[in-house]
Amino acid sequence: PGQENVIAFRITDPNGNFNWKDSQVYTWGEYRTNPSHGFGGITGKVELVATDKLYIGDVFIKNQPDPHSIEVEVTACNETKNPMKAQKMLLTVKEHKGEKVLYRKEYSVENLVVGENKQTFHIHLPAAKLWSTDSPHLYDLSVSVGTDNYTQRFGFRWFEVKDIHGDKQFFLNGKRIVLRTAISWSFWPDNGITPSDELARRQVESAKKLGLNMLNFHRTIGHSNVLDYADELGLLYFEEPGGNQYPISHFNDNNKQSKFYFAYRNEKLVRMIKRDRNHPSLVIYNLHNERGAWPQVQDYAQMRMAHSLDPTRILTCLLYTSPSPRDISGS
């Protein structure tokens, strides 16, 4: 504190793969990993925020089957050396493009231990306008505690699969929706790896002009600015971490290579879900795409982990081997 600080970034691309394929595992020193697309760097909008020792670390707004209801999970971080007694926490919901406040309530939060503290609040707003592909209404939820304030944009909506006489169908806010989608490989002009705001908006607008109501981030984690415009303009998205091939014969080696692989693939998935789980446009996570092996114990464990991080979205996992593909999914 009070001194000059240096933040250093190391960017590596040991494989240098400019092919569209990300399926071949390669050896990098003592590790096996998946190839990238030959690009590297800071791909998002990054900011460094200074806070007091009591601050809001995260807000997860969980949509509910009643689309006018939300469950708000707030992570308050106590970085002092001692537990804190009762603190006041203010929650406010207002229109994203407007001044109308729909909800404002102060809560008393008891006994904040040192470290992370999760608090859950249930909010039901019958007057809230629902988010849909035709009417993408957005709201801001603000949480204040101590001197810190955290604002998260979101939409009221519920996306689900229903069994209609043996036929699985998608529903958005209780109405059937037939998904018309295409894949985006996330190769972008100018720098290859990430879109400018102009290109991000253009992709969403182009998809809607073509009559699509959805796009897939194919074999790659998506970009926040693309999802931001999808939220604003009304386009659904499917997202997957990508590059999850690994020799099935080495799944249970329990050596440095396998430990690195499973730690790496799980970390990618965790970061993807935590970053993107408040976007109303994002409705499906896919854990693996066309992996040539049957699901293993580690795959089911990864799906349970993903579901615990975000129980509000559909999870799929496409694994296959001869003679036919097999899908494991949960919602």
Q: Where are the predicted features?
A:
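Solvent-exposed loop/turn segments at secondary-structure junctions
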Residues: 221-222, 243-245, 289-293
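Active-site neighborhood of glycoside hydrolase catalytic domains
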Residues: 261-319
